[in-house]
Amino acid sequence: MRFNVILRYVGAVMLCLSAFMAVSAGISLVSNDAGFYPLLLSALLTLLLGAFPMIFVSKADSITTKEGFMIVVGSWVLSCVVGMFPYLIWGGEFTLVNAWFESVSGFTTTGASILTDIEALPQGLLFWRSATNWIGGVGVVMFALLILPSLGTNKMALSGIELSSLAKDNYRYRTQMVVKILLTIYIGLTIITTLLLKVSGMRWFDAVNHAMSACATGGFSTKNASVGFYDSPLIEWILIVIMFISSLHYGLIYSTFTRKANNIFRSEVVRVYAAIIVGATLLIGASLYFSDTYENIFTSLRQSAFQVVSLITTTGFATANTNLWTPFAIVILIILSIICGCAGSTSGGAKVDRVLLYGKVLKARLRGQQHPNAIIRIRLDGILQEDRQVNTVTLFLTTYFVLILLGTLSSALFGMDLLSAFSSSVAFIGNVGPGFGAVGSLDNYAELPSILKIQGSILMLMGRLEIFGFIQFLFIRMWR
């Protein structure tokens, strides 16, 4: 394994991050706030980290699979490390552990925060927080692949590693188109969202920040009360639509606009996903109305729809204190936080594709018990699922729930109540953000012991890297 090659590619990612830090510093300079020097110094340090390997290490004609995993996972981890720099230099609530937690939460698009007063941050730092969401939404490596043409033909190997296996199955295009498709949709959707939010009453700065977070399904807001600060049905419905679109498979979005056969409207996964959202919204809305949580059915359904879409897409924006909702509503929201959005999107979580496939596997096994000699084929969105794919999904979901269980046990060991411990573990591994109980939708993670913040950051990284990518990185020396 050639570590010099790995350093060159990771260095490319660092150059991208330094550019975003420089933009954030420019915002602080224009707004004349105290975030300028922390961001400028961070940009220079990150630039140096990225420039040296790019200058002194020659390009490689090819990279191995092992090197590819090291590049992708190493880029994510180092991005989280340099992402700490502006927070640490700024100080305030950002201790070493808090800065690490906030950085990991941003890049993994979890959106969980240790800040007790978000609005006290300078505008430049607020923009940097949202930028970490936006960069992490499509993948830190993907940005480097788009921006730096010097990475050459190895782009394809890296983009394949960055995507989950289910996502790759659903991209029915030439591999070299994947990066362009992803980022064209991503950037276009961000611009459209910004304009819509501005027209709806947000300031330009807030509109840009919320657009970046919404399209990344990240959830960082510039307000302590999140989207609830605006108390605007129009803003809420705009964000509901954008969060939903962002949680759909980007390949299917592209197919829909290019009028190909495999599009959103013909996708079995999207139909099931939409049905789950509508069903959950109606059930929770009815629960809120009949429990007199809200004064009328329309407000109940609006609040229900926003929180349902926010959690199932793993965005984590909030307009209500869900801790005050009925136990029935809370249970449904936790289930949605486990299922989450579609593969090939910016959403985290187990993915509705996997859950649906697992349901088909169970159905096939039951049929196999009734008809032992039958040959039962399992298809998902028209694609025949091989035994290897089925076994991978089963193993993934098993590992996913084991990690939630271990996270819950560990959190309970350090004094968290069961609801807070379980929901925070679900929120971390699923990159959802808010949980329930002590870490509810309008609360934060400031009071967590440092050890649990570190545990949470590890779970966030594992979730964002689809678990196995992180595990393979840890045991990469054992590969043959």
Residue ranges and their predicted role:
Residues M1-R480:
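Membrane-proximal intracellular helices of multi-pass ion channels
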